[in-house]
């Protein structure tokens, strides 16, 4: 059991002074207001509720540091960044996604984020493309291992662009038809079964018909 004393804490009904939070197994078990600190308390100035990361692509954590560069021709742009992102996306399998997402989620938790909306479009494991929902399970494992609260938002990605009705080769691991996507969404709702939330994402006007 751990106790934290906050000089000020933001509770559901607003700010309170001299608040003690008692934690059991990593969760807040008891909240007391108007109490003096004692020697066993960890003392903090302010405590606020955990934040929510409202838009995450966890696999891109592995891209950090690989795109902070300039070409000699100075022609870098979002589109050159996207090519490197696609290269990474095509190489991430389920085992790698679990490890990358676990690291990203642990970093979120240590920074004060206690929930995450994961906008996910790596729907197929490149090493085992016929194994259904391996990448979904990888994210669930990462969230469970880290302890973050997950909202899974599968993203529909149908085509390469307005004038190209088919996905490009480097998009095939995550491109889906609408009926495939709706089936994935239904399976995700059943798989999470109350342990998290499931949303629906459409990538963009460019990528969705």
Annotate the PLM regions:
Residues 88-130, 136:
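Hydrophobic alpha-helical hairpins/lids featuring a short glycine-rich hinge
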Residues 40:
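A cross-family signal for N-terminal binding/gating loops and helix N-caps
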Residues 1-36, 46-47:
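N-terminal metal-binding scaffold of metallo-dependent hydrolase/deaminase domains
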Residues 7, 26, 44, 55, ...:
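Divalent metal-coordination and catalytic microenvironments
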Residues 49-61:
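Histidine-centered catalytic micro-motifs
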Residues 126-209:
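Metal-coordinating catalytic core of metallo-dependent amide/deamination hydrolases
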